[in-house]
C-alpha cells in the first residue's frame, strides 16, 4: 500500500491516489465522510471549519460499493477556493493580482521562511499553502480506508487527549479500551474525564481572548493486533519506528513515545519490562504493557499505545516579530486565520495516520490481492500465534 497527496490550502481541491488496497473491501464515500467530520469537530475550532464541510469524491478503484484492487482516487473540494480564484490561479495573471496577497513577512514556527529559502520563492505563500494542516484532511480520508481494512480483521483504533494546554487529564487506572473509545468520542475535547471539561474549555476561551494558542499530548491506541508484526532484522523494518516517523509528519507534532515513553529514563529495568505470562486458553500475554505493545520493533500482542506531543499552533493573533524578506526590516509576522487549539482534530489525524501504517504493514506481511485471501491468511496467523 502506498499513496500520495496533492493540493494547497486555498487551492481547488485536495487529491490522493492510493495503491494496494485489496479487492473486495466494502467502501463508500459516506464511510470516509464520517471520518472527515470527526476531524472538523472539537472545541476551539475556528472559522475555516464553518466554511468547509469536507466531503470526498471517489473517482476510481471502487465499483458497486467494493474496491477493485485498482488505484483509488480521492478528491476533496476546497469550498473556500471561490474567494481565492485569482490569487491561486493556475494560469499566469496580471502583476497587480499576483501581488494582491503576497507574503513577505514569514510567521515563526511555520514553513514560510525556510520553504521560501529552499525553493527560491519571492512570495512565501507558495510554502504556506502546501505546508498547511489542511493537507491532513486527505490523510484522514486515506486513513478511513485503512481503518475499514482493520475493521474487517477485528482491529480497533481510538485516540484521546492526555494533556490539554498544560492541564493533565485524570484517566482512571486500567480503564478498558472500549470505555476510552466511547468516552473520548462523546467529548468535544476528546478527553475521557467529563468532570474536567468545564475547566479546560474556560482555559481555551481565555487563551483565545489573549490571542494565543495551546498544545498538548495525544494518545492513540490500536487494539486487537497479534504478536509479530514488524521485524527486528533491519532497522527500517521496525514497526514502532515507522509509526514514530508518521506521527512526527503531522503538522505541529514535535515528539513521540510508546508506553511509558520518556518516563523509562527515570526507572530501573525491573520497573519497565513486561513480564511474560501464558495461559492454556489465551496463550502468551504480558502482565503489563509498559513498552506500549512493542519489543524489538515488533508487536507483542498487547495494545499499541503511542503518544504524540503537539506544539501550540504557531499562527498567533498577537503575532511574534519577524523580518520582511524584501526589506529585511523587522515587522510583526503575517496573521492568517487560525484556531486557539486543534488538539481534538489532531487526535483524529494521528489515529488515522497510525492506522494507515498498521494497515500497510499487514498488507505487506500477508497475501492481500483480495480481502478473502487477506482475512484467511491473517486469521490463520492469529490462530497460530494463539497456539504457539
UniProtKB/Swiss-Prot annotation:
Q: Name one GO cellular component term.
A: cytosol
- Which keywords are on file for this protein? Amino-acid biosynthesis, Aromatic amino acid biosynthesis, FAD, Flavoprotein, FMN, Lyase, NADP
Give binding positions for NADP(+): 39, 45
Source domain of life is Bacteria
Paste the cofactor note.
Reduced FMN (FMNH(2)).
Q: Reaction catalysed by this chain?
A: 5-O-(1-carboxyvinyl)-3-phosphoshikimate = chorismate + phosphate
Q: Can you tell me which residues bind FMN?
A: 130-132, 251-252, 296, 311-315, 337
| Disulfide topology | none
GO MF assignments: chorismate synthase activity; FMN binding
Could you confirm whether the keyword Cytoplasm appears in this record? no
- Could you state one GO biological process linked to this protein? aromatic amino acid family biosynthetic process
Pathway of this protein?
Metabolic intermediate biosynthesis; chorismate biosynthesis; chorismate from D-erythrose 4-phosphate and phosphoenolpyruvate: step 7/7
Per its UniProt record, the required cofactor names are: FMNH2
Under Enzyme Commission nomenclature, its number is: 4.2.3.5
Q: Which SUPFAM superfamilies match?
A: Chorismate synthase, AroC (SSF103263)
By its UniProt entry, which PROSITE patterns does this protein fall under?
CHORISMATE_SYNTHASE_1, CHORISMATE_SYNTHASE_2, CHORISMATE_SYNTHASE_3
Q: What does this protein do?
A: This reaction introduces a second double bond into the aromatic ring system.
Family membership noted in the UniProt record: Belongs to the chorismate synthase family.
What is said about its interaction partners and assembly? Answer: Homotetramer.
Put simply, this protein is called Chorismate synthase
Originating gene: aroC
Amino acid at each position: 500500500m502506498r499513496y500520495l497527496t496533492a493540493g494547497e490550502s486555498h487551492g481547488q481541491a485536495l487529491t490522493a491516489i492510493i495503491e494496494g488496497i485489496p479487492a473486495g473491501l466494502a467502501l463508500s464515500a459516506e464511510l470516509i465522510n464520517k471520518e472527515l467530520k470527526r476531524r472538523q469537530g472539537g472545541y476551539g475550532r475556528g472559522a475555516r471549519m464553518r466554511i468547509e464541510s469536507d466531503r470526498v469524491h471517489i473517482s476510481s478503484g471502487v465499483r458497486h460499493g467494493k474496491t477493485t484492487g485498482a488505484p483509488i482516487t480521492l478528491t476533496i473540494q476546497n469550498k473556500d477556493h471561490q474567494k481565492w480564484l485569482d490569487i491561486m490561479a493556475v494560469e499566469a495573471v496580471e502583476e497587480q493580482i499576483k501581488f494582491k496577497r503576497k507574503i513577505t513577512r514569514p510567521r515563526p514556527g511555520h514553513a514560510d521562511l525556510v520553504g521560501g529559502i529552499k525553493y527560491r520563492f519571492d512570495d512565501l505563500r507558495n510554502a504556506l499553502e502546501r505546508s498547511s494542516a489542511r493537507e491532513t484532511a486527505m490523510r484522514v480520508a486515506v486513513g478511513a480506508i485503512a481503518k475499514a481494512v482493520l475493521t474487517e480483521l477485528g482491529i480497533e483504533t481510538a485516540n484521546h487527549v492526555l494533556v490539554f494546554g498544560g492541564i493533565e487529564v485524570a484517566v482512571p487506572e486500567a480503564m478498558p479500551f472500549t470505555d476510552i473509545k466511547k468516552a473520548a468520542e462523546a467529548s468535544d475535547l476528546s478527553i475521557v474525564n467529563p468532570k474536567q471539561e468545564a475547566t479546560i474549555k474556560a482555559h481555551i476561551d481565555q487563551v483565545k481572548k489573549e490571542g494565543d494558542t495551546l498544545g498538548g499530548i495525544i494518545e492513540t491506541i490500536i487494539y486487537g493486533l497479534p504478536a509479530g508484526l514488524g521485524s527486528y532484522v533491519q532497522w527500517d523494518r521496525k514497526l514502532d519506528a515507522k509509526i514514530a516517523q508518521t506521527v512526527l509528519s503531522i503538522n505541529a507534532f514535535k515528539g513521540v513515545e510508546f508506553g511509558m515513553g520518556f518516563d523509562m529514563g527515570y526507572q530501573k529495568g525491573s520497573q519497565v519490562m513486561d513480564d511474560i505470562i501464558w495461559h492454556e486458553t489465551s496463550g502468551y500475554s504480558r502482565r503489563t504493557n509498559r513498552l506500549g505493545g512493542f519489543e524489538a520493533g515488533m508487536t507483542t500482542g498487547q495494545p499499541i499505545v503511542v503518544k504524540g506531543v503537539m506544539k501550540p499552533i504557531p499562527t498567533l493573533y498577537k503575532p511574534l516579530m519577524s523580518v520582511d524578506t524584501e526589506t529585511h526590516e523587522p515587522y510583526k509576522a503575517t496573521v492568517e486565520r487560525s484556531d486557539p487549539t486543534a488538539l481534538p482534530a489532531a487526535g483524529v489525524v494521528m489515529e488515522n495516520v497510525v492506522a494507515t501504517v498498521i494497515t500497510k504493514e499487514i498488507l505487506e506481511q500477508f497475501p492481500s490481492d483480495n480481502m478473502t485471501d487477506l482475512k484467511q491468511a491473517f486469521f490463520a496467523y492469529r490462530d497460530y500465534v494463539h497456539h504457539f
